[in-house]
C-alpha cells in the first residue's frame, strides 16, 4: 500500500499574485489530501490542472477540489472530471471564488493508484 507523495511550493516573497503549487502522486486508492498552510486572501484568477504522462498518468476523468478552512471548494466544482490527456485551465473569474483562509487543502479522487499531476493556483492578493 503506497502513501501519497506531495511537494508544495509557494512564493516566499509577497508578490501581488500569489502562486501555490502541489506536485502530487496519489496513494493506493487514487486519493490525495494535502494542506498548504499560510495566509491566502484574494481572488483566484487562474488554476492549471496538469496530469503526468506515461506510467503515472491518472485515470481519465479524475476529480480535483481545493477546499478552504470552511470546507468550501474554491474551484466551485470546476475541477470535476479532469481529462488526463491535456492540461486543464480554469481562468474564468466567474468560475472560482474569493479566498480568505489560513489553509487550502488539495483533494484528488479517482486518479488511480500511484498516479500524479501538478495543480497550480494563482491568487490576486486583496
Please annotate each region the language model reported.
Residues 2-126:
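Surface-exposed, low-hydrophobicity beta-strand/loop segments enriched in small/polar/acidic residues
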